[in-house]
């Protein structure tokens, strides 16, 4: 399967960087806050309310569809606190910008952004010292960390309103084109396009 759709959508910048930058800043903050709330819910075993996160992703997508420069400039800003959340927001912004560049539909781009944002949701219940460790992990620790994919897929599969494309992104985000990834060692075209 090709990366570009058969009939790509072409997007033109509708705003300047200056016009888009301040709006993109608010969208980024909203996205980070909604992700934080969702991760707290996961951590404490509460029901997941995906609507707020989807709304925030849609706001980011609309900003990037108008002009991706604002969101891309914001990626360059660093925050010592909340690195992980900003990393996921940045990854989501890059996925949305790539979807725009490749000409995907707005629905596909929204799924790309949501999948990238939630890509590590399965780590919410792992010990933070394990996730932040600078030491080499033991085989047992590696196995524990790798289970986050299955945990995320199980959680999101039972969450209403999460598209199959989003779950595919999360299920296959650690698969490598050469088959060296995990959890299923998928190769090449066996990896869904949106997870590549």
Please name every model-derived segment.
Residues 81-112, 151, 185-190:
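Alpha-helical phosphate/pyrophosphate-handling elements in metalloenzyme active cores
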Residues 91, 109-135, 152, 168-181:
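His-Asp-centered metal-binding catalytic motifs of divalent-metal-dependent phosphohydrolases/nucleases
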Residues 62-69, 122, 160-168:
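Proline-centered turn/helix-capping motifs that create local helix->coil transitions or kinks
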Residues 1-78, 82-83:
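Non-catalytic interface/linker regions that flank or bridge core catalytic/transmembrane domains
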Residues 57-61, 71-75, 95, 112-116, ...:
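Short alpha-helical scaffolding segments that buttress acidic/His motifs in well-ordered protein cores
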Residues 97-101, 124, 155-159:
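Signal-transmission/dimerization alpha-helices at domain junctions
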